[in-house]
């Protein structure tokens, strides 16, 4: 029967049959709307939270990068030098040595008349004038400095004698304002009596090196005879109760009449193993001090030419520690030399050079706490160098009239220059990180005591004489190696975990 002919009730039932499959929620329309709003809010909150979290991570990484950039960039910054004061000491004697006190409050100038003048570093006001105890009628013919740290020096006399003295400061603090008060002094740790190195012959050159209570002197007389002397302090058991002294010196001498020298300069290394004899043309000959006192006929064991071409040395000085020898010449070049050992063969090798200018180098002054030094040339151009980093931190003309001498403070924060006219100029120095350079971080560096350049990381040691080694290559290689071995274990675990999770979720 056609659907059109069905009764109305039956037709209504047929039309209503599909509606029986629709599931009607038991919740009211208000609760459904509330649930939808809550779901929408949760989705929105999660979306914002994830976005904020991701952006925060990126911002945090950028801030870390900015902080590291802020901390690292100053490591490569150069030094700054600013004039602090200038004054005239009114001293006509030639300068043998300039030195600055530990905290840059006072300075000392030793003249060729044997008088040490101590003065305020900022004002130039005289604090004390002390004459070294030189025998009556004797004149100074040569000078040698042990090291800037010890303050010990030797004066060679025209009588063939040598006086060993030390400049120092006694420190006390005022009771009212706790102000630091310095009292300069010249003392004689190895006795006031001069040491005889030649008989009635002026000492043309002299070298001094000390270690604790032991001292070694080397000198050449005008005739060319080389003399060696060792002195060791012998303290008696009752020295603590003897206010008058109680100390004696055991002295050992050796006159090497078979070695006739000319006007060579003498230097003793920091370990007192070698005597460097350097002539005016830069030829260095080395005598072993371990056998010089006992061998019947000691001879020079090593030799090397310290200059290139027709250059002649103008100033020579040991770097901090007494291992490296700095040589400045009349062509403006500065070179670093030290002894190396390969297969039981010892050689004096040129490690690196610093070409500052074509003007002759006048003076070299090593720092007391870092492997750095200061140079000044004949035109008054001052440069700050670091040997390990092979870096020139500063260069500038600070003495228009030329320079006679210069000194850098123990902390490296002050520079004192005596000009060609005898005026003193004090300069404030800020040179925080001279030992950092791109080559020191990523290239092979030839460190003191090593036979060849190498990648080494060793940032500190027990003494200031240590040469810091900042190569990042060992650290980077170690980090990458550790990451590689970690990935060998982490990668299989991650892959297997992903597979397991995928099957579990399925």
What kind of feature is each model-predicted range?
Residues 2-30:
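N-terminal intrinsically disordered, acidic low-complexity segments at the extreme N-terminus
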Residues 33, 37-45, 75-109, 114, ...:
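Periplasmic/extracellular loop-to-transmembrane helix junction in inner-membrane transport proteins
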Residues 41-72:
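Hydrophobic alpha-helical transmembrane signal-anchor segments
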Residues 54-61, 477, 481-489:
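Hydrophobic alpha-helical transmembrane segments of multipass membrane transporters and ion channels
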Residues 104, 113, 150, 158-159, ...:
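Surface-exposed loop/turn positions within WD40 beta-propeller blades
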Residues 107, 152-153, 216-217, 275, ...:
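Hydrophobic beta-strand positions that form the internal "hydrophobic ladder"
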Residues 116-121, 162-167, 226-231, 284-289, ...:
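WD40-repeat beta-propellers
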Residues 486-506:
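Transmembrane-helix boundary motif in ABC transporter permease subunits
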């Amino acid at each position: 029967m056609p659907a059109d002919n069905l009764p109305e009730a039956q037709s209504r039932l047929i039309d209503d049959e599909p509606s029986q499959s629709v599931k009607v929620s038991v919740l009211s329309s208000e609760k459904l709307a509330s649930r939808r709003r809550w779901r929408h809010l949760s989705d929105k909150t999660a979306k914002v939270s994830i976005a904020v979290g991701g952006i925060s991570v990126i911002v945090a990484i950028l801030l870390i990068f900015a902080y590291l950039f802020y901390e690292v960039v100053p490591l490569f910054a150069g030094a700054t030098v600013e004039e602090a004061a200038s004054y005239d000491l009114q001293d006509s004697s030639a300068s043998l040595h300039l030195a600055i006190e530990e905290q840059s409050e006072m300075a000392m100038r030793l003249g060729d008349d044997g008088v040490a003048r101590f003065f305020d570093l900022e004002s130039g006001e005289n604090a004390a004038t002390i004459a070294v105890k030189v025998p009556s009628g004797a004149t100074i013919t040569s000078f040698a400095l042990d090291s800037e740290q010890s303050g010990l020096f030797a004066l060679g006399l025209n009588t063939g004698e040598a006086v060993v003295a030390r400049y120092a400061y006694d420190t006390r603090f005022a009771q009212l304002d706790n102000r630091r008060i310095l009292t300069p002094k010249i003392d004689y740790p190895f006795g006031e009596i001069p040491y005889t190195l030649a008989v009635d012959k002026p000492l043309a050159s002299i070298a001094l090196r000390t270690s604790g209570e032991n001292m070694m002197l080397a000198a050449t007389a005008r005739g060319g005879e080389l003399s060696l002397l060792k002195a060791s302090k012998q303290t008696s058991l009752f020295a603590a109760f003897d206010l008058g002294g109680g100390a004696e010196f055991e002295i050992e001498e050796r006159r090497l009449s078979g070695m006739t020298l000319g006007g060579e300069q003498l230097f003793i290394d920091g370990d007192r193993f070698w005597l460097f004899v350097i002539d005016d043309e830069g030829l260095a000959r080395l005598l072993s001090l371990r056998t010089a006192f006992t061998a019947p006929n000691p001879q020079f064991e090593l030799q090397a030419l310290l200059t290139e071409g027709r250059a002649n040395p103008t100033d020579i000085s040991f770097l901090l520690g007494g291992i490296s020898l700095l040589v400045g010449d009349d062509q403006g070049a500065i070179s670093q030399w030290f002894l190396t050992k390969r297969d039981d063969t010892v050689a004096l090798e040129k490690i690196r050079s610093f070409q500052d200018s074509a003007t002759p180098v006048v003076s070299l002054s090593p720092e007391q706490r870092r492997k750095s030094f200061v140079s000044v040339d004949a035109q008054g151009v001052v440069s700050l160098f670091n040997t390990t980093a092979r870096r020139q931190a500063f260069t500038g003309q600070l003495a228009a009239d030329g320079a006679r001498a210069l000194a850098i403070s123990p902390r490296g924060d002050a520079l004192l220059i005596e000009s060609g006219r005898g005026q003193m100029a004090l300069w404030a120095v800020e040179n925080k990180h001279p030992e950092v350079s791109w080559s020191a971080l990523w290239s092979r560096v030839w460190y003191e005591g090593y036979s060849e350049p190498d990648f080494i990381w060793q940032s500190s040691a027990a003494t200031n004489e240590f040469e810091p080694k900042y190569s990042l290559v060992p650290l980077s290689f170690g980090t990458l190696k550790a990451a590689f071995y970690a990935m060998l274990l982490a990668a299989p675990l991650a892959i297997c975990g992903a597979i397991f999770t995928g099957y579990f979720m399925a």
